[in-house]
Amino acid sequence: MANIHIVIPARLKSTRLPNKMLADIAGKPMIQRVYEQVTKSKFDSIIIATDSQKIKDIAESFDAKVVLTRDDHQSGTDRIAEAVTKLGFADEDIVVNVQGDEPLIPIENIERAAQLLIDKSEAVVSTLCEKITDVEDIYNPNNVKVVFDKNNYALYFSRASIPFERGFSEKEQINISEFFRHIGIYAYRVAFLKHYAELTVSPIEKYEALEQLRVLYNGYKIAIEQSAKSTLAGVDTLQDLEKVRKLFNV
């Protein structure tokens, strides 16, 4: 039986919110908050993969297992691929990528992503989404949108408003029932993770800055379904960070 592991990619030099992995949330750095949240799961291991000696030292201070990776990776998935290779995980094992900026991620969503990959044998990656309920979120590039087919395989991910509802402008009320926000959690089989790192970064991946597009561009399937539980988007801005801080300080 395949083992299931959680790997948290943690890059220090984030673009939109520098050093966010170490941002204080109610007395603890964000990376610790994320780690403590995922320890509520029952998977085989939890690893932090980072390019930063500073993050490594802090993570080891709260007894996390850490793998130090190169600092030139194109994406978190590339970083995880290096980590699982170093750790010697079996090809049939499953790895769940939990973003290092989601300290409130529901455990139910992590479990659902892993189970979806087990259930969808044609997919090499699985992920989650949720219905958009605020029209403003459709036009926010920090909220990645996704469209998928009738069999729940992703067709495309974009920072733009997809699907495009012809005949409406951004200022008009549109039917938001067909808009879904992608939740940045992924489950992969280790064999595909190793292959992913060998694939060339695709033009659409560069254009959208979305690592999952490398999978679709190369003809592989991503299984997707709605999340088990609603969650906040990842912390990308100072405003996002303040929202999370308020929730921890309640």
Curated annotation (Swiss-Prot):
KW Coiled coil (keyword) present: no
Name of this protein: 3-deoxy-manno-octulosonate cytidylyltransferase
Annotated gene: kdsB
Function statement: Activates KDO (a required 8-carbon sugar) for incorporation into bacterial lipopolysaccharide in Gram-negative bacteria.
InterPro entries the record matches: Cytidylyl_trans, KdsB, Nucleotide-diphossugar_trans
Family membership: Belongs to the KdsB family.
Positions in coiled-coil regions: none
Predominant subcellular localization, coarse grouping: cytoplasm
GO cellular component term, pick one: cytosol
UniProt-listed SUPFAM superfamilies: Nucleotide-diphospho-sugar transferases
Catalytic EC class: transferase
Gene Ontology biological-process entries: CMP-keto-3-deoxy-D-manno-octulosonic acid biosynthetic process; lipopolysaccharide biosynthetic process
Compartments in which it is found: Cytoplasm
Pathway the protein contributes to: Nucleotide-sugar biosynthesis; CMP-3-deoxy-D-manno-octulosonate biosynthesis; CMP-3-deoxy-D-manno-octulosonate from 3-deoxy-D-manno-octulosonate and CTP: step 1/1; Bacterial outer membrane biogenesis; lipopolysaccharide biosynthesis
Keywords: Cytoplasm, Lipopolysaccharide biosynthesis, Nucleotidyltransferase, Transferase
HAMAP family from the UniProt entry: KdsB
CDD domains: CMP-KDO-Synthetase
Reaction catalysed by this enzyme: 3-deoxy-alpha-D-manno-oct-2-ulosonate + CTP = CMP-3-deoxy-beta-D-manno-octulosonate + diphosphate
One Pfam family hit: CTP_transf_3
